[in-house]
Design a protein with these regions (language model features):
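Catalytic cores of the polymerase beta-like nucleotidyltransferase superfamily
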Residues: 1-402
Length: 402
């Protein structure tokens, strides 16, 4: 029998209180999914989810009686969130699928642990553990797959994908995180065969999963595999023909500069340097207005590799300037840009329109024109202080008078 190691999270007071409340009458609660998988792999655990045969109302009653705050976050689907000792834990009643359409599932509550596990996606995610003893339940070979670095669907791969088409993208993400060696052939063939079904998913779900893939420490291999498999023909037809070289340079520069991965920056590496295309992709993926503007700005200025980083930041912000250098620069220029922008904020021009008027310029369009010229010179001189800005204003006004 496989038993969880004595990980720190297993002794947290909040978790112990929840387990005690739900198992007080001899009922069962188990740790499920990622916490079990990651603990077995020796990885840090962030979310500790639980499952129980108790119905949601009974779960809430018991937790409330134990003075544990509980929120009915997804009670229609059997999920509540318990907050104990500052920790948040999702607790879900065992379920079975009644009907699925590739986008959502209609479920019924159940009392069979294996049946609950069978509705999950991959064998490595269908591991359950006793919170007291750490004993691991494995009905579908997840332990062997975890040891082998194999990401495989539970049972029939085509059926699992038909239940939720997002599992196509999840396959690639989990393979990148936990896979070693060749992809599981049966699962891989199934996602390729079903790739057109991605069109049925909401744009938000596609965007969320795609950005998670791009946020992985080094997604180059899996992104290349997705391109080879025709996944991007369905969800990102704008994929640039030369994306691999740009993506490789970006990842190398991120490593060189120790800059944290950013999904949006990496998404821009997959696209042509065309702001219209960037906006088109952002709109289709239902990205926020801020994200849309950021993608477009990167595309518009990606070839601007001569202008000093701080001057570029004045035009499009420090994040945009840094991202452009990481995308388009060599390692030396990327490093120089990151160093120049680190901890630096774009300053405001230390002059206002009133300062121009005070120098004798009549209120009107000349004020804005002179102020714009002063700002351009001030930026070109690397943002000097107020005294130099005033000198520049006097010079510009003098030229106007001449």
């Amino acid at each position: 029998m496989t038993v969880l190691p004595n990980a720190e999270w297993r002794t947290r007071p909040g978790l112990r209180r929840i387990v005690a409340a739900l198992s007080a009458d001899g009922d069962t609660v188990k740790i499920v999914g990622g916490a079990v998988r990651d603990t077995l792999l020796g990885l840090a655990v962030s979310d500790i989810d639980m499952a129980t045969p108790l119905l949601p109302d009974e779960v809430m009653r018991r937790l409330t009686a134990a003075d544990i705050k509980v929120i009915p976050t997804g009670i229609a689907h059997g999920t509540v969130t318990a907050i104990a000792s500052g920790d948040h834990h999702e607790i879900t009643t065992l379920r079975r699928d009644v009907e699925t359409d590739g986008r959502r599932a209609t479920v019924a509550f159940a009392d069979d642990w294996r049946e609950d596990a069978a509705r999950r996606d991959f064998t490595i995610n269908a591991l359950y553990a006793d919170p007291e003893t750490g004993a691991v339940d494995d009905w579908f070979g997840g332990l062997a797959d975890l040891a082998a670095g194999r990401v495989a669907f539970i049972g029939d791969a085509a059926t699992r994908i038909a239940e939720d088409h997002l599992r196509i993208l999840r396959f690639y993400r989990f393979a990148a995180r936990f896979g070693r060696g060749e992809l599981d052939a049966v699962s891989h063939d199934a996602v390729i065969a079903a790739r057109q079904s991605l069109k049925s998913l909401s744009r938000e779900r596609i965007a969320d999963e795609l950005l998670k893939i791009l946020a992985l420490p080094d997604p180059r291999a899996i992104v290349g595999q997705m391109a080879t498999d025709g996944i991007f023909e369905v969800l990102l037809p704008e994929l640039d023909a030369d994306f691999a070289a740009v993506f490789d340079r970006l990842l190398a520069n991120e490593t060189e500069t120790a800059v944290e991965p950013a999904s949006l920056r990496r998404l821009s590496a997959l696209l042509p340097a065309d702001p219209a295309i960037a906006e088109q992709v952002a709109s289709r993926l239902r990205l926020s207005t801020r994200q849309k503007k950021h993608l477009a700005a990167i595309a518009r200025h990606r070839s601007d590799i001569v202008r000093p980083a701080r001057q570029l930041a004045h035009a499009i912000g420090t994040d945009g300037a840094r991202d452009i250098r990481l995308l388009s620069g060599d390692r030396a220029s990327a490093r120089a840009a990151v160093d120049a922008l680190d901890g630096w904020e774009v300053p405001a021009l230390p002059l206002k329109g009133g300062d121009i008027v005070a120098r004798g310029v009549t209120v009107g369009p000349d004020v804005a024109r002179i102020l714009k010229a002063v700002e351009a010179a001030w930026v070109a001189e690397d943002f000097p202080g107020a005294a130099r800005a005033a000198e520049l204003a006097d010079q510009m006004i003098g030229r106007t008078s001449d």
